[in-house]
Amino acid sequence: MDELHALAEEHEGLLTSKEARSLGIQDSVLVRLAQRGRLERMSRGVYRIAHYPTDRLAQYREAVLWAQASHHGLERIALSHETALLIYGISDLNPSRVHLTVPKSARLRRERPEWITVHQADLTEKEVGQHEGMPVTTVSRSIMDVFSTTHRTDIVRQAITEALRDGLLSSAQATGLRRIIISSTAESLSLSINGSKVTGA
């Protein structure tokens, strides 16, 4: 159990069955510990040390560990979209689901918890940063992801303004994002108008 405690310390009390196996601890041992109340099974392949203090980021860590446990060798997993904006503190949104981006080639074999939304995209190294030990898409990437999936200009404009205020974006980056959003919005409006039918003429 001491080995599991040491392992879980790296993830604020969380560990995966894959990590335990690397220490020579079989899945059956984890199952028995869970039955005895020493571990809590959070999702398939993810456990928490019982009574371990949790923090506001616990669910995000669990989502990342779930994805890592779901696919061998999965690289460039990152918390993303609305979740990333919330982590950076640049959005008033409080999404009920945790948004996570995994590579397009990923075939997640484990049952997905209903509170996780999985997006698939091939992130570059420069598009992923770290926040309190967790992989998170960069501010710029997160804003564009939210815009591409929601088309909510109010959300992304607020995020850009607050990121600029907090020093998370440079003036040049903020200007570039605003131009992309304005251009995309204008293009969408043009396509909508051109594609509409005129009746009653």
Q: Which functions belong to the PLM regions below?
A:
Residues 1-138, 145-201:
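Short gly/ser-rich loop at a beta-strand->alpha-helix junction or flexible surface loop bordering the NTP-binding
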